[in-house]
Amino acid sequence: MKRIKKGKFYVVKRHPGFIISADEQKNKYLAVVTGTSKDTRHKTQLNHPIEPGVKESYVKNRPVLGKKKHFGSHELVGLRFHPDDMPLVEEISRRKPQKLK
């Protein structure tokens, strides 16, 4: 079985998601979902992109709570948050999460 690790990026509904907390016993994973869509409703633009070669990245204003089946099986390599954007990510991670169906 795959193991989802805290602090890594995985696919969440076709978008990169940064795992904030992982509880394997209860099968609950909390993630902040990012993307590059210009539709800025319910999203905040990051100061620096998370991918090389992309002009701008966005992050959803609420984290998502899901089970292991909601996340992709492979870690997304090469993605990272800039240290200037981490306070925003930590603030979003404390908000009430949306549950994935």
Q: Across the structure, where does each feature detected by a protein language model lie?
A:
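Mixed-charge, Lys/Arg-rich low-complexity intrinsically disordered regions
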Residues: 1-5
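Compact nucleic-acid interaction/catalytic patches
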Residues: 6, 13-52
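C-terminal terminal-subdomain/extension
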Residues: 49-101
